[in-house]
Amino acid sequence: MGGQSKVFTLAEVSNHNNAKDCWLIISGKVYNVTKFLEDHPGGGEVLLSATGKDATDDFEDIGHSSSARAMLDEYYVGDIDSSTIPTKVKYTPPKQPHYNQDKTTEFIVKLLQFLVPLIILGVAFGVHFYTKQSA
């Protein structure tokens, strides 16, 4: 890796996306891994699926050995113009609406739904019981 390295745009690197011409972007550097496709332990399809984007996360998630990282040097062709790589949008879930933070009103409603029928039943039973004794 001596001298000035060539700087590529994402569009330029994205053109190299097949089994006869395969380039990857890893940690801001561009690698021509075409010759390595057949020898890659995970298969060439794994490498081809990582073309046209920043493959750094894919590379790091696998947990490559130090010898695999050293092999990258022989496939190095230049650097990527980082301004051409789209920024990752971090997903933030929408905040949940807080309809009823004070649960006391909900509790009172449930309590009344339980007690009102019992009170009606008790009154009906009492009326029936007292009218039966009087007669």
Swiss-Prot record:
Membrane topology category: Single-pass membrane protein
Gene Ontology CC terms, in alphabetical order: endoplasmic reticulum membrane; intracellular membrane-bounded organelle; membrane
Biological role: Cytochrome b5 is a membrane bound hemoprotein which function as an electron carrier for several membrane bound oxygenases. May play a key role in the modification by desaturation of fatty acids in the endoplasmic reticulum, which in the developing seed is utilized for membrane synthesis and in the developmentally regulated production of large amounts of storage lipids.
Record's protein name: Cytochrome b5, seed isoform
Family to which the UniProt record says this protein belongs: Belongs to the cytochrome b5 family.
Keyword Membrane in record: yes
PROSITE patterns: CYTOCHROME_B5_1 (PS00191), CYTOCHROME_B5_2 (PS50255)
